[in-house]
Amino acid sequence: MADPVAGIAGSAAKSVRPFRSSEAYVEAMKEDLAEWLNALYGLGLPGGGDGFLTGLATGTTLCQHANAVTEAARALAAARPARGVAFQAHSVVPGSFMARDNVATFIGWCRVELGVPEVLMFETEDLVLRKNEKSVVLCLLEVARRGARLGLLAPRLVQFEQEIERELRAAPPAPNAPAAGEDTTETAPAPGTPARGPRMTPSDLRNLDELVREILGRCTCPDQFPMIKVSEGKYRVGDSSLLIFVRVLRSHVMVRVGGGWDTLEHYLDKHDPCRCSSTAHRPPQPRVCTFSPQRVSPTTSPRPASPVPGSERRGSRPEMTPVSLRSTKEGPETPPRPRDQLPPHPRSRRYSGDSDSSASSAQSGPLGTRSDDTGTGPRRERPSRRLTTGTPASPRRPPALRSQSRDRLDRGRPRGAPGGRGAQLSVPSPARRARSQSREEQAVLLVRRDRDGQHSWVPRGRGSGGSGRSTPQTPRARSPAAPRLSRVSSPSPELGTTPASIFRTPLQLDPQQEQQLFRRLEEEFLANARALEAVASVTPTGPVPDPARAPDPPAPDSAYCSSSSSSSSLSVLGGKCGQPGDSGRTANGLPGPRSQALSSSSDEGSPCPGMGGPLDAPGSPLACTEPSRTWARGRMDTQPDRKPSRIPTPRGPRRPSGPAELGTWHALHSVTPRAEPDSWM
């Protein structure tokens, strides 16, 4: 007679697929072990989830059970585990050092005293850190089997194993006869051993057949997997003569497979060919199947590829149809698509540092090619997200938008900058380059000042503008009316030029009118200066020196050597601030302390340039013995309303009181406009 245990092991080895459901019965085993330990020691361990392992994490329950097994072994005649373990049972926190020490003590006892195989052992981290709960459960089941041989209470699964073993060892003529030898020793408790709790009886098998039929009825295939009932809890599966033992463990239908247990659902998934080749019977299982249904588009497109990225993913949608079919069915009118919601003329991508000519080169030559290729096919170097396939796309940017883009870029550029770097770049379209350069020359003009003080308007491309850079444009003589005529013929106003660019464009005047305007401004400055000097001369401030014998003026600042308007403003501001003698005196007539020297910074100028400190008196001893000395004064600035600089400077020696005279700087501005009025032009 063949060994029945070998037949059960062979049925597990002949499965269609590898054994992957070893974790399916872990939850059922944890529930069984929790009930077993609660019955032995009156604990309150939860059966499901992480509560069971959390209750065992301290190791006290494990060590307590080890001592119980040792005491049961002492009652036997055979020398079984002869030494217990010492452990800490009070104030133990899961994950602490004492908890780890208790778990390690139990592991050492199982390995040395109980002789548990190494394949069923677990490590400390497996229980404390939940790294491998399956090993913990299998080790506890093995310890329960060893304890059941000594007369201890066994879990329900161990009782099922004992029932199955008795049924397999029973002879056919006498099925009710008890097994002899080792089986009697294992199941009967040792004499004299006290009862350790109520004995758990096997569950009733009356509902087992109904549960099995319910699980088999989930498969709706015409040719179902055969599972024939031989007796209570014994079934023959498939076309072979292999027998399986089925038991009910609470809400789980368990199957005895080899030396362990498995659920009936996973057992059928491994052995039923219909369940192996289809995923309809296992919707919650994440296993990889041999057949994976793919999404197929209901309408096939005649083109192999679509220029719109992502159209393959939307091919299964019924409302998406090919362009060719859409044109034949609906005519020239195209139904709305998600891509049609984008603006019709998307702006080209501009990077920081791009010049105007580089932007025009990106829109001149390649623009026509892109507009021609948009509606023909998927020929693209880089797929654009804003292209549409319904109708031929229009050019991405009309010529009018070219000037608008230049205006946007010129907002952050200085007005006095010379020709941009775009003039040195090669442009594919010469006509567009010439037209864009002419617009730049007409729109941006620079003020050029010669050595003799003459001012004139110069196009940006003709002069360096003080920056030292030159452009390859050829200087051309233009008449005063030429820019206006060319500007009217320019297509920019017709195509919607930005109004802001018109206001930023300097006024174009005739050179003669410019010179006449400058002369009027100079005459107005001189007239105002004379009027202010006349008002200031009414106040008695001391003898006014003769302009003919005025001392040599100090070297003025280099920033005002070539600027006629700036020097004129110096004289005006000097007259407004009054005489320096008034500012250097106090209420009692004595000279006050010298005022703080002004900074040379153009942003921190003084509103009164004539004020600088006490001046030399003609009759004072210091004026006779010491030659005239030039005092450092603050540079005049274009911002007279600003306060003087706070930078401290050394103070000079005080001079005795006496009649003050006009400062040399004020005398210079009061004489020079009268003496040489034509030199400023």
UniProtKB/Swiss-Prot annotation:
Residues 542-556 have a biased composition (Pro residues). Residues 291-303 have a biased composition (Polar residues). Residues 168-204, 278-509, 536-681 are annotated as: Disordered. It comes from the Eukaryota. The keyword Hydrolase does not apply. Residues 186-199, 354-365, 475-493, 557-571 have a biased composition (Low complexity). Residues 327-342, 370-381, 404-413, 437-454, 634-644 have a biased composition (Basic and acidic residues). It is found in: Cytoplasm, Cytoskeleton; Cytoplasm, Cytoskeleton, Stress fiber. GO terms for cellular component: cytoplasm; stress fiber. The modification Phosphothreonine is found at residues 193, 334, 391, 498. One of its GO terms (biological process) is microtubule bundle formation. Gene3D superfamilies: Calponin-like domain (1.10.418.10), Gas2-like domain (3.30.920.20). The modification Phosphoserine is found at residues 306, 316, 352, 355, 394, 436, 438, 479, 486, 490, 492, 657. Residues 27-148 form the Calponin-homology (CH) domain. Residues 203-275 form the GAR domain. One of its GO terms (molecular function) is microtubule binding. The keyword Ubl conjugation does not apply. Keywords: Acetylation, Cytoplasm, Cytoskeleton, Methylation, Phosphoprotein. The modification Omega-N-methylarginine is found at residues 487, 504, 633. The modification N-acetylalanine is found at residue 2. Interacts with MAPRE1. Involved in the cross-linking of microtubules and microfilaments. Regulates microtubule dynamics and stability by interacting with microtubule plus-end tracking proteins, such as MAPRE1, to regulate microtubule growth along actin stress fibers. Belongs to the GAS2 family. This is GAS2-like protein 1. The gene is GAS2L1.
